[in-house]
Regions:
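Paired intracellular helix-loop junctions of major facilitator superfamily
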Residues: 43, 98-107
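Helix-to-loop junctions at the C-terminal end of transmembrane segments
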Residues: 31-44, 133-134
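Multi-pass alpha-helical transporter architecture, strongest
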Residues: 64-68, 138, 144-172
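Cytoplasmic membrane-interface "Motif A"-like loop-to-helix N-cap segments
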Residues: 40-54
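A membrane-interface helix-boundary motif in multi-pass transporters
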Residues: 45-48, 130-148
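A late C-terminal transmembrane helix in Major Facilitator Superfamily
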Residues: 31, 104-136
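C-terminal ends and interior cores of transmembrane alpha-helices
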Residues: 55-69
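Short amphipathic helix-loop junctions that connect adjacent transmembrane helices
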Residues: 1-15
Length: 172
């Protein structure tokens, strides 16, 4: 959050706090949009929405990374908010996608596992990203963030052909 902004982009801590807050707000709006788009355009296929969100996350983090430290604050704001808009969709939809694919037989287990991995990844990403940034620099931290977004997109792509849920197959 603020450390990344101040150390890699030279943003003051007061501006960094505001940027992080706006990132979170953009994330909430993106999460709501991802849910709506899943229902409206992708016929409940949350995994497809996640593909687009992860691609957007990778793109906007890359663009943010490439901005020079003396870039206008509004440009940092725009790219960071766009990244936040894309990042929160998969976080909200992964539990739904897993529960829908698992059907009622294992929906609670699927949701529990996605929650477990979500919390574990938060712990690992905080420590891991800090380690990479401290020992190898922020450029490698950005590479790691973008790399994980691409890996996430590829994992969701594996489900591209899946139905919105497994309930039809369960009754057949």
């Amino acid at each position: 959050g603020p450390s990344l902004l101040s150390q890699s982009k030279g943003v003051s801590m007061s501006h960094a706090g505001w940027l992080v807050a706006m990132f979170e707000i953009a994330g909430i709006l993106g999460m709501l949009f991802a849910g709506w788009a899943t229902d409206k355009w992708l016929k409940g296929r949350a995994h497809r929405t996640c593909v687009f969100c992860m691609a957007g996350s990778a793109l906007f983090v890359f663009l943010f990374w490439q901005l020079p430290a003396d870039a206008p604050i509004w440009l940092l704001f725009a790219t960071l908010c766009a990244a936040g808009f894309c990042i929160y969709g998969p976080q909200a939809l992964i539990g739904i996608a897993a529960a829908n694919q698992a059907t009622k037989r294992a929906a609670a287990t699927a949701n529990g596992l996605t929650g477990l991995f979500g919390y574990a990844s938060t712990l690992v990403s905080g420590v891991g990203l800090g380690f990479v940034a401290q020992h190898y620099g922020w450029n490698w931290a950005y590479v790691g963030i973008i790399g994980m977004a691409v890996v996430g997109m590829l994992v969701f792509l594996l489900m591209w052909g899946a139905r919105a849920d497994g309930y039809e197959a369960e009754t057949e």
